[in-house]
Amino acid sequence: MTKNNHQLLIALGSNIGLATSRPVDIIKDAIIELSKSGIILKSLSRFYETPAYPQGSDPNFVNSVVKAEANYSAHAILQKLDKIEEKFERQRNSRWSARTLDLDLLALEEQVLPSKEVFQYWCDLPLSEQKKKTPSELLLPHPRIQDRVFVLLPLLDVEPNWLHPILNKTAVQLYQKLPEQTKKNIQTMQ
């Protein structure tokens, strides 16, 4: 690790192309934009195709995870991710809607933001409430990592021993706890 840089994990997803770009191309271009923004890429997962949520509601997603380093605060990284999403015409029409690009800061070292209590509130929020509510502040680690096969499987490619700072489980352990049916719905892309 470069002096003063922080280890971070970013999830990438896309299920709507642009005029000249398919979702997989958007993910590849977004990775280039991450590098241009001062985020140093260390490793990239394979690309995975996953159903949209709820299944059948929208085109399938292309998902990936990058392990990176940066000498920025969590909030500065989030601003950079938002600018990259804007470059790819990201629209925030509704929660969990189709999108050209979704960049999520999954973790920044062992940081818990804004607090363990706030994280726990969002982590424990019932699905019916998750559909309606959106956090107004940055949450780290991302409160849904443990629930999402489209995050955990790519995460296994780049950092299988990543330890969740609150749940105290590795990425491998979190993946193993997922229902088998959800694991069947994800495909490695060629």
Language model features by range: what are they?
Residues 8, 40-43, 60-64, 99-103:
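A generic structural signal for short beta-strands and their flanking turns/coil linkers
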Residues 12-14, 66-70, 107-110:
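Short beta-strand-to-loop capping motifs
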Residues 34-38, 84-89:
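A common structural junction motif
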Residues 43-70:
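Short, charge-patterned binding micro-sites
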